[in-house]
């Protein structure tokens, strides 16, 4: 009888120990879950603190061969902004682009020139969207536009690619809800000459007109950096060349 009682007590004790072990494991899981949630919140807050007010991405083709060509209007305009703020670009591997940040009225703004060829601009824009901004509406893409004449500059809040292969690639990865600043380069005499047209330098008259368009946009740089889009549109579109 005594042996039976001892056996029963041992079983009961074993069961209690198992229950205690299970409760400890459950308690550990609850603690770990809370800890992981807290860590995630801290990481999210830190990432949000690193997000930028605006990223301005200038499209173009890298290399001396394509410097100052029609397709590189985006690059050229960003160079002017950098000059305005007396700063220089440095390569940032994380987004595979030439990159610089500027401070303006308590805001941080990035100037970005993708290192990929213009038809593959989506790669950098996808990384910009992932690491640098809260929303695609905080991205301004600067590019050439054959539907506008040299000297024309317009702002667009969203839309399609209008045949621009750089925009086409961007739309595939981040959608169409980003702002665009479009500099006119005009049409070639024949549609068949489009590919060669965009990678050639503008003639002297076109160059002067494009310089005027750059100047008009630079005159609005404060508003651009503050994302006062409607004011900019009103100014640029009401003073069309």
Which residues make up each language-model segment?
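Hydrophobic alpha-helical segments within soluble ligand-binding/sensing domains
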Residues: 163-166
């Amino acid at each position: 009888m005594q042996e039976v009682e001892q056996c029963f007590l041992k079983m009961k004790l074993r069961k209690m120990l198992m229950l205690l072990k299970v409760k400890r494991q459950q308690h550990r899981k609850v603690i770990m879950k809370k800890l992981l949630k807290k860590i995630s919140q801290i990481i999210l807050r830190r990432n949000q603190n690193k997000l930028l007010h605006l990223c301005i991405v200038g499209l173009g083709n890298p290399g001396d061969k394509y410097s100052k060509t029609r397709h590189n209007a985006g690059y050229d305009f960003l160079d002017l902004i950098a000059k305005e703020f007396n700063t220089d670009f440095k390569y940032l591997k994380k987004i595979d682009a030439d990159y610089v940040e500027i401070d303006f009225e308590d805001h941080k703004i990035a100037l970005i020139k993708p290192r990929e060829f213009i038809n593959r601009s989506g790669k950098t824009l996808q990384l910009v969207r992932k690491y640098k901004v809260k929303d695609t509406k905080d991205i301004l893409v600067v590019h050439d536009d054959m539907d506008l004449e040299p000297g024309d500059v317009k702002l667009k809040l969203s839309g399609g690619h209008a045949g621009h292969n750089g925009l086409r690639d961007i739309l595939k990865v981040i959608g169409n809800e980003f702002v665009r600043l479009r500099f006119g380069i005009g049409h070639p005499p024949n549609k068949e000459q489009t590919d060669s047209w965009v990678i050639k330098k503008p003639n002297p008259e076109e160059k002067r007109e494009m310089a005027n368009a750059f100047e008009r946009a630079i005159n609005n740089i404060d508003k651009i950096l503050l994302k006062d889009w409607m004011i900019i549109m009103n100014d640029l579109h009401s003073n069309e060349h």
